[in-house]
Regions:
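Conserved protein kinase catalytic-loop anchor
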Residues: 162
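Noncatalytic carbohydrate-binding groove/subsite architecture in carbohydrate-active enzymes
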Residues: 225-256
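Hydrophobic residues within beta-strands of alpha/beta enzymes
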Residues: 17, 165-167
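Acidic/aromatic-lined carbohydrate-recognition and catalytic surfaces
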Residues: 1-155, 159, 172-229
Length: 256
């Protein structure tokens, strides 16, 4: 495992390791479908193994950065298991549920993985939003309880002594609450990205995250900002924005 190779990594001059998701997951999307944020995927070991790796890495001057996936969870996460049971349970609004429209999906949004971004659920005769796999329901960041759950989980990891977070598609956590149809560029489905990327409250949420968690620890943060232009990227990581330290985005791949 990683721990046994730390000396080799140090000899190479590596001083930071970024771990892709190692949390408990059904592994529908390479671990980006998390079913328990406070457990390690069995294929990788145990939490005791993680703690030992972190300790040994720090002994060698190597920092550990965790992947943070909080736009969505696995459909096997305890929150979603409860959320889908009824329309009035305490976890219902942890996710984005909508009534169908004329016997079809709530709008024409397509998933990043193909097909509709809405999955019908027979238990309550409603649809839930998943911008990625149908096994990755999007969290409802409009719900303050969801945000507090996320901040509590982040604090838990910071207290362990990790050195940073790489935040997966973090600019997608705020959705346009009118959920309008998207432009149909090709195919059958509309593009959801104009209504979920750089949404109306995303900077509010990140400032709140910074105030409640990040500023309390000596950690590095880098956010993945899907479909963000360079001028907007600077709003996430400006010197005085109190949000993230860095972002990476993909505008450059379309140059030339």
């Amino acid at each position: 495992g990683i721990t046994e190779h730390l000396d080799y990594l140090k000899e190479l001059g590596i001083d930071v390791i970024w771990l892709s998701p190692v949390y408990q997951s059904p592994n529908d999307d390479n671990g980006y479908d998390i079913s328990d944020y406070r457990a390690i995927m069995k294929e990788f070991g145990t939490m005791d193994d993680f703690d030992r790796m972190l300790q040994e890495a720090h002994k060698r001057g190597i920092k550990i950065v965790m992947d943070l996936v909080v736009n969505h969870t696995s459909d096997e996460h305890a929150w979603f298991v409860e959320s889908r049971k009824s329309k009035d349970n305490p976890y219902r609004d942890y996710y984005i549920w909508k009534e169908g429209k004329d016997g079809k999906e709530p709008n024409n949004w397509g998933s990043n993985f193909g097909g509709s971004a809405w999955q019908y659920d027979e238990a309550t005769d409603m649809y839930y939003l998943h911008c990625f796999s149908k096994k990755q329901p999007d969290l409802n960041w409009e719900n303050e309880k969801v945000r507090e759950e996320v901040y509590d989980m982040m604090t838990w990891w910071c207290e362990k002594g990790i050195d940073g977070f790489r935040m997966d598609v973090i600019n997608m956590i705020s959705k346009d609450q009118s959920f309008p149809d998207g432009p149909v560029d090709d195919g059958l489905y509309g593009n959801h990205q104009p209504f979920v990327c750089d949404g109306p409250r995303v900077h509010e949420y990140l400032k709140e995250m910074n105030q409640k968690v990040l500023q309390k620890y000596d950690i590095m943060t880098v956010g993945e900002a899907l479909n963000t232009k360079i001028d907007h990227a600077m709003q996430y990581a400006g010197e005085d924005t109190n949000e993230l330290n860095m972002v990476f985005h993909f505008e450059h791949v379309s140059l030339g």
